[in-house]
Amino acid sequence: ILNNTNLLTDEANSASANDMMIVVDSEKENIMEEVMPAIDEFLDDLSAKGTSEEAQAATSWSEAFDLLPEANVALFSIPGEYGAPEMERALKNDLHVFSFTDNVSIEDEVRLKKLAHEKGLLMMGPDCGTGIISSIPIAFTNVVSPGNIGVVGASGTGIQEVTTIIDRLGGGVVHAIGTGGRDLSDKVGAITVKDAIVALENHEPTDVITVISKPPAKEVRDEVVELLQSISKPVVAIFLGEKPTSHEGKVYLAHTLEETAKIAVDLANDVAVKKNYFEALAKPAVPTLPEDKVVKGLYSGGTLASEAGMLISEALDLGGLVKAEGYVLKSHGYEVIDLGDDMYTQGRPHPMIDPDVRIEKIREYAQDEKTGIILFDVVLGYGAHEDMVGALLPAIEEARATAKEAGRDLYFVANVCGTTKDPQNYQSSVDRLKEGGVLVAESNAKAVQLALLLKGIEISEDDKEVVAYNGPTVDVPKPGEKVMELLTTKPRIINVGLQSFTESIVDYGGETVQFNWRPRANGNKKMIKILDALEDYSEQIEAENHKVTDKIKNAQPFLVDVVPAKSVIPELNDDAQKTLLHAGPPIQWSEMTGPMKGACIGAALFERWADNEEDALKIFEAGEVRFIP
């Protein structure tokens, strides 16, 4: 991040995994006179806050289990390079894993999910940003009414769009189990999706099961459908990218996320599923855009971007989706960008949190005379920006003014993904956007429909009938006891990483303890692997250590002799070389902590190598002192 933003100073480059870095880039020569007091105040506030909070925060797994002995979930938001071993440790301690942590290799994901399955646990993730367990929102999640619909989703914003529409339709969700976007890939084989479906089939309060997937591997998709056709509960499923022409057997197949939610609510209310849920929209009372004007989509949600790109491509026969440089659609001037793609998040926060990259693109598109409509999403909920609407409106107003000066019409069309119970409030967000001249639709699919209508293009959906399913079925396995215990109680969560994730858990009645995790061995991955391997022999090591300590306890020490240090330590006899002996492993001055450096400066003054602390510091920084363990 620092390198990409030209802030990687020599000092920052030498920092280790447990260091805090504060880097300032300013044209003011005396900026440090302003910055240092602010840093001191921040650290003082942090320290004061810590005295009240750290009493209930753990710094190790053993402390976390002491604080919450009945824990059954570990929620991870730590750097991916350290993630897999920590998740494995959690699974081996019989904890379900919810991993917001990403950048975990596909090989590690497969290994961890197989381990979880063998132990009767759920491995939700990696790269799982959204979940609802027993109506408690976890991570980047909306506040949804409790109900009788269970959701399994390999898509974060897909879960958010479906569950929030369910809420606004008067329905409710008891569980939304995120799996991570790669779960239905051929390598992973839908391990978590299958386990979650089986669990919801056996969960009595769940009456309807909803499955949401990014484009799956065909063989894996077929296996999931076979399982869905084998269970007793009604199912609605959406495999993004597919345009089903009928429902199959027990499984209702949706084309859009909105249709998915509407079918789920009808099933939950014992209402007959309609042949068609498409609703025509009235065209706004504004001039129709000419044919050469195009739609530009700027999305913070990857699944919402894919759905928008899919619908535009289908309507205009643009050849389908792409995946290049953040684009999900780029054809004939039409563009839809997933601003949450790695290309846009490297070195900066996710666009659900930070509006800057979208503001930049709004300004860029406003200058393009071909742009007629800018289509975008606003995702509300825990973890999202506290006021994304307020952050975007000035840029929208500026862009419309730019177009007006050039004699062009420029329309903004938005979908707000949220509920009235979200911290940002759905209705307030919608009202403020409308006041700012934005056309707001009730769903992402309707937002695309409205955008095309502004160009005079009307779209529709064909009726879908239920046809017989003639494929194979499977014997539905029994769910693990630990999974069922998770679904029938409030979760008890060890939060490993971002403390802000505890907020929604506490607000909605879950138990949690904060684990202020840091990488072991100062982030040295080789040493971490060694320590992890040693843990498998912890009982034997403890037994051998007891033998040694017993010998020490039973021994009787006695004085042998007292001699000058120089007589037994030859390194101290070189008067030309300043030497300090220290406890612990070898260490250099640059690697020492503040207290250790202070002790060294004190030793230098005692030995009269310097007259004051400033001169002593120069001696050490010049490398004049040798350190011997």
Outline where the language-model segments fall.
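Catalytic-core regions of core metabolic enzymes
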Residues: I1-D475
